[in-house]
Swiss-Prot record:
GO terms for cellular component: cytosol. GO terms for biological process: 'de novo' IMP biosynthetic process. Keywords: Hydrolase, Multifunctional enzyme, Purine biosynthesis, Transferase. GO terms for molecular function: IMP cyclohydrolase activity; phosphoribosylaminoimidazolecarboxamide formyltransferase activity. Gene3D superfamilies: 3.40.140.20, Methylglyoxal synthase-like domain (3.40.50.1380). Belongs to the PurH family. Residues 1-146 form the MGS-like domain. This is Bifunctional purine biosynthesis protein PurH. It catalyses: (6R)-10-formyltetrahydrofolate + 5-amino-1-(5-phospho-beta-D-ribosyl)imidazole-4-carboxamide = 5-formamido-1-(5-phospho-D-ribosyl)imidazole-4-carboxamide + (6S)-5,6,7,8-tetrahydrofolate; IMP + H2O = 5-formamido-1-(5-phospho-D-ribosyl)imidazole-4-carboxamide. It comes from Trichodesmium erythraeum (strain IMS101). HAMAP family: PurH.
Length: 517
């Protein structure tokens, strides 16, 4: 008796070639359902329709096609168990040797902006996962294929083993099947959960958090050469950095990607005027806004030209030739922008190892951040709060000018993306001093002011969290800073405010803290 293969796929890639090889090379008989059967018949391949094989028609508009004992009995039968063989014979059920199934494109459907809940529901596959799980469970007796990338491997397995398939290969395919159904069910559960989550309280009460990823590539190594690292994408469709275009340069490393993401989070704060951010080890070392992208780059670079060496540069406007020429004067790891002019691309070629990326995804924000801890992981909302000036409190006698408010807004946006304890000193919408990751706040203040030097005179200072004492205010005033922005909330806020008044400074309390660890 011929071996029996069941083919039922939504993605028809490679299907016809597989079916032809099964029939002509290995003497398989094929049963198939719905659109798959039509595709194969149109290609001249003899197929028995599932409804003809089971003696039961497809019903409910195709919702029920393969959910039948003649199908699942043939899949789940243990060929080495006499009782199973007897039951197959008694019920006129043939054992199935190969199941080729992939599922309705649920994730592709829900990725469409206008999709309705009813449309999404219709793309939830029922028969497909049932066959995949049954086949994967019974891998000792048959093979299951759930991806067209497996087809050639399966045929080669048959060719090198005289038409047989090794247990090792079948088990590997079974694992792929279970991963496929697990990811599929997770996508459905996540989508339905999001449909029902409407309030902040419901968001905080999710009892199960779903997280899975599809491998993009194995990276050369992790943070250090002795660490293994892999890059995954969420969902089946490439997005974010996975969908960015790499114009030139070496492959992206783990550290490159981490730094690029930090750069993206800064640059999306600035959507209008040309803005450039230069980062090193996820901390900004220079950020500037100006009338042209070249001027913004030059001022960001001047903010800390030493640290910019080997840094990551993110721009919110397309790169022109003049800016590309300026960037090639120093060693940089990566440059990313929403576009790059042809002349700029030519200039970058002189730095063949420089990674240049085009990414239109600067406006996207991941909904949450995740940190792994022993025994689990922590999930929090992304700190993408948009601060409103109307909510800020000017707590000093001296009032800010319109220009000073704009400067304080700029400094506040930048300090949000500096590791805590964080202090940023800016002037004319460019950073001139950054104190990052210090264990005490006044230490961060001193580092930022020392870096700024005389540029601090007339500048403003931003702090990601409150001042526990008034020493930071006094230190800033002594360096020539004219205005301070900070969240407030310290038991000794009054001391800091009093010091600011005494020294003629402006102080604004935002009421929002921006710790970053």
């Amino acid at each position: 008796m011929k071996r029996l293969a069941l083919l039922s796929t939504s993605d028809k890639t490679g299907l016809i070639d597989l079916a032809k090889s099964l029939v002509t090379e290995f003497d398989y008989e094929i049963i198939s359902s719905g659109g798959t059967a039509k595709t194969l018949k149109d290609a001249g391949i003899y197929v028995t329709k599932v409804s003809d094989y089971t003696g039961f028609p497809e019903i409910l508009g195709g919702r029920v096609k393969t959910l039948h004992p003649r199908i699942h009995g043939g899949i789940l039968a243990r060929k080495d168990l006499p009782q199973d063989v007897e039951e197959l014979n008694a019920n006129n059920i043939r054992p199935i040797d190969l199941v080729v199934v992939n599922l309705y494109p649920f994730e592709e459907t829900i990725s469409k902006p206008e999709v309705t809940l009813a449309e999404a529901i219709e793309k939830i596959d029922i028969g497909g996962p049932a066959m995949l799980r049954a086949s994967a469970k019974n891998f000792a007796h048959l093979t299951v294929l759930c991806n067209h990338f497996q087809y050639n491997s399966y045929l080669e397995e048959l060719r090198k083993n005289a038409g047989e398939v090794s247990l090792e290969f079948r088990q590997k395919c079974a694992l792929a099947g279970f991963k496929h159904t697990a990811t599929y069910d997770q996508a459905i559960a996540t989508y339905l959960q999001e449909q029902q989550t409407t309030s902040e309280s419901e968001k905080s009460e999710k009892e199960i958090f779903f997280l899975s990823g599809k491998k993009i590539k194995t990276l050369r190594y992790g943070e250090n050469p002795h660490q293994y690292a892999t890059w995954y994408q969420r969902g089946i469709n490439a997005s974010g950095w996975g969908a960015s275009k790499i114009i030139q340069g070496k492959e992206l490393s783990y550290n490159n990607l981490v730094d690029l993401e930090a750069a993206r989070r800064i640059i999306i704060e600035f959507s209008d005027a040309p803005t450039v951010a230069i980062l090193k080890h996820t901390n900004p070392c220079g950020v500037a806004v100006d009338e042209t992208i070249l001027a913004a780059y030059e001022r960001a670079f001047a903010g800390d030209s030493v640290s910019a060496f080997g840094g990551i540069v993110a721009l919110n406007k397309s790169i022109d030739a003049a800016t590309a020429k300026a960037m090639t004067k120093t060693f940089l790891e990566c440059v990313v922008a929403p576009g790059c002019e042809p002349e700029a691309e030519k200039i970058f070629k002189s730095k063949s190892k420089l990674r240049v990326l085009i990414s239109p995804y600067f406006k996207q924000s991941e909904p949450e951040t995740i940190k792994v801890i022993s025994g689990g992981f922590l999930v929090q909302d992304t700190d993408d709060t948009i601060d409103n000036y109307s909510d800020w409190k000017i707590v000093t006698e001296k009032q800010p000018t319109t220009e000073q408010i704009e400067e304080l807004m700029f400094a506040w946006k930048v300090v949000k993306h500096v590791k805590s304890n964080a202090i940023v000193v800016t002037k004319n919408r460019a950073t001139v001093g950054i104190g990052a990751g210090q264990m005490n706040r006044v230490g961060a203040v001193k580092i930022a002011l020392e870096q700024a030097g005389e540029k601090a005179i007339g500048g403003v200072l931003a702090s990601d969290a409150f001042f526990p004492f008034d020493d930071s205010v006094k230190t800033a005033a002594a360096a020539g800073v004219t205005a301070i922005i900070q969240p407030g909330g310290s038991l000794k806020d009054k001391d800091s405010i009093a010091a600011a008044n005494e020294l003629g400074l402006i102080m604004i309390l935002t009421g929002i803290r921006h710790f970053l660890h």
